[in-house]
Regions:
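N-terminal membrane topogenic signal
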Residues: 1-14, 238
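Bilayer-spanning, highly hydrophobic alpha-helical transmembrane segments
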Residues: 16-17, 229-260, 272-293, 574-603
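Actuator/coupling domain of P-type ATPases
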Residues: 23, 40-126, 138-145, 152, ...
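Juxtamembrane helix-loop transition segments at the membrane interface in multi-pass membrane proteins
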Residues: 56-66, 103-113, 291-310, 619-625
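Conserved catalytic phosphorylation-site environment of P-type ATPases
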Residues: 67-72, 171, 271, 281-357, ...
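Membrane-embedded transport module
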Residues: 245, 506-510, 547, 552-625
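P-type ATPase nucleotide-binding
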Residues: 337-463, 472, 484-500
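Conserved ATP-binding TGD loop and adjacent catalytic N/P-domain core of P-type ATPases
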Residues: 399, 425, 431-575
Length: 625
């Protein structure tokens, strides 16, 4: 509890003890009416002086209609009618509800702060063989910092020395450690688990991943959802309306009674009007709706899903169309050897020859061959390298001529080669003028991609579409394997934007379209869709800037998880609105009819608020979605 909350708690306890004492004494001793009034004023002012002060300032500043005004009028009115206990009790229970709400909101904020506890307090710099702690803001680009086991990585950079495991769970929601060694890029916010590592910084602290993420989460509350805006407007008109309704309830029925010759019953109708005022307090809705979105954004952050505002969370919950980029989203975006079909020599030797022949090339295919070979390249074994544009390469390896390339290269050399029906890039190999076999290289599908498509369907997505610049046979194979509904291949970036616009025109107004890409090459499409989702954005400034929602790792399952989180959050928002307004409507009618007394009014106000706040906090719990 904060100091302010502790003070309120002490006031609540003192006031409650005084009320109980007065009731007990009053049951045994006859107390003079004026003395009783004076005695009850003590707990009343102890518990309610701040509410009365706020109500007075509201009237003074011409901002009359708020919950403080409602409580002040209701309690002063009850006391004026001689209902001292009820007047003080209404103020007491209102303050109990306010304390609970303050504590719950504070707790949810602390939970989110703990979930996103990635802000580093210091950076270690080595000076004369000793580590010195400095403020991360003071560290310049190119400085070598030291991170020891258990410490947070304070600034983005490249590992220059050491090996370690990193806990990235605060960023990605994943508990599996990430291994790093010299030469690997590393981002701020991770926790070093094992070895000491030295990192050469590549950014200033203010531009580091950790700073961008924290700014994003902290600023998310400024972008209001339609539901929040509706509640704000609703409260703006609702509170004056119920005040005037209560005034009418206090005046009109007694006047009608007088006209028809019955006793006016002013006391009865004023009491009903005061009960009406207490019931009508809109706290439950006004507090619980923003709190639900706040908790939902915090829970999503814990799962490695960064949402830039509650408006995006609300839009995401209505997503019916999901369009994907293929490379880096559904596939790893890295070429790998997926098949070796030897003809005259064994597979390992075939890969070795291809890796050596292609070793001077910087093409991704060359890198995949060297990765498959898995050993260092001895450049002294290679000579007479000749690259033939659009065909491949011819080189001498250990004095023997090796040709590695596509079918055009084999045709140029007059060699017959084996056609391969499998989809992928084929690298044909010839050794001393004789066809030796071919290697199949492909962009590998991520292990969770197929499950991700199934999860999207279960989350209510109507259609999945893949957009790619790849050849049609490659694109079709990936789409068929994953169960994607539609696929468009050989697209330029502008073509992708056109396709997104085409689907935007097809869908209904209530249905929303999300585009998922890597956030770097897909910025125009991300900004054109109803919701732009950037995947695998750890360390990618472009992704964080371009998208509405940022997935911190490259697991496609997170797309469905983000949608499920948004649906749960919106469900809680609607539950609170319907529950709070429903209970209040029933109690308002009962209060106007004289069936509900002030104690029922206290439940309709404080009780409903407590239940709604507790329900809102459920939005933090997203682990099992």
């Amino acid at each position: 509890m904060t100091k302010k909350q502790k003070k309120v708690l002490i006031r609540i306890i003192v006031s409650a003890v005084l009320i109980v004492a007065l009731k007990v004494v009053g049951s045994f001793v006859e107390i003079n009416r004026y003395l009783e009034f004076a005695l009850y004023m003590i707990p009343y002012f102890v518990i309610g002086y701040d509410i009365l002060r706020k109500a007075f300032l509201g009237i003074k500043n011409k901002q009359v209609f708020d919950e403080n005004f409602l409580m002040a009028v209701a309690t002063v009115g009850a006391i004026a009618l001689g209902d001292y206990t009820e007047g003080v009790a209404v103020m007491l229970f209102y303050q109990i509800g306010e304390l609970f709400q303050s504590y719950a909101v504070g707790k949810s904020r602390r939970n989110i702060s703990e979930l996103m506890d990635i802000r580093p307090d210091y950076a270690n710099i080595e000076v004369d063989g000793e580590l010195r702690q400095v403020d991360p803001d003071e560290v310049e680009i190119g400085t070598v910092i030291v991170v020891t086991p258990g410490e947070k990585v304070p600034i983005d950079g490249v590992v220059t020395e050491g090996e370690s495991s990193l806990n990235t769970s605060a960023l990605t929601g994943e508990s599996v450690p990430r291994e790093v060694k010299a030469g690997d890029e590393i981002i701020s916010g991770c926790i070093n688990l094992s070895g000491v590592i030295r990192i050469k910084t590549t950014k200033e602290f203010g531009e580091s991943t950790v700073s961008k993420i924290l700014d994003l989460v902290e600023n998310a509350t400024s972008k209001k959802s339609h539901s929040e805006n509706f509640i704000s407007k609703f409260a703006h008109y609702y509170t004056p309306a119920v005040c005037y309704s209560a005034l009418a309830l206090a005046i009109i029925p007694p006047i009608i009674n007088l006209i028809i010759g019955n006793p006016a019953g002013f006391g009865t109708w004023i009491y009903r009007a005061l009960t009406f005022l207490v019931i009508s307090c809109p706290c439950a809705v006004v507090i619980s709706v923003p709190l639900s979105f706040f908790a939902g954004i915090g829970g999503a952050s814990k799962a490695g899903v960064l949402v830039k505002g509650s408006n995006y969370l609300e839009t995401l919950s209505k997503t019916k169309y999901v369009l994907f980029d293929k490379t880096g989203t559904m596939t790893k975006g890295v070429f790998e050897v997926v098949g070796v079909h030897d003809n005259t020599i064994d597979k390992n030797h075939l890969i070795e020859l291809a890796a050596y022949a292609e070793s001077y090339s910087t093409h991704p295919i060359s890198k995949s061959l060297q990765t498959a070979y898995g050993k260092g390249i001895d450049k002294s074994r290679i000579s007479d390298v000749k690259e033939i544009s659009g065909h491949g390469v011819i080189a001498k390896v250990d004095g023997k001529e090796v040709a590695a390339g596509n079918g055009k290269l084999m045709d140029m050399l007059g060699l017959k080669y084996t056609e391969c029906e499998q989809v992928g890039t084929k690298v044909h190999i010839a050794l001393d003028g004789e066809y030796a076999g071919h290697i199949l290289i492909s962009d590998v599908i991520k292990p969770t991609s197929k499950q991700a498509i199934a999860e999207l369907k279960s989350a209510g997505v109507k259609k999945t579409v893949m957009l790619t610049g790849d050849a049609s046979d490659v694109a079709k194979q990936v789409a068929d394997e994953l169960g994607i509904d539609e696929v468009y291949s050989e697209l330029l970036p502008d073509d992708k934007v056109s396709k997104v616009e085409e689907y935007l025109s097809k869908k209904s107004e209530k249905e929303k379209l999300a585009f998922v890409g890597d956030g770097i090459n897909d910025a125009p499409v991300l900004s054109r869709a109803d919701i732009g989702i950037a995947m695998g954005a750890m360390g990618s400034d472009a992704a964080i800037e371009a998208a509405d929602i940022v997935l911190m790792d490259d697991d496609p399952l997170k797309i469905a998880k983000a949608i499920k989180i948004s649906k749960k959050c919106l469900g809680i928002v609607y539950e609170n609105i319907i529950f709070a307004l429903g209970v209040k409507l029933v109690c308002l009618i009962l209060g106007a009819l004289g069936i509900a007394n002030m104690w029922v009014a206290i439940f309709a106000d404080v009780g409903v608020m407590v239940i709604a706040v507790l329900n809102a906090i459920r939005a933090l719990m997203v682990k099992k979605l």
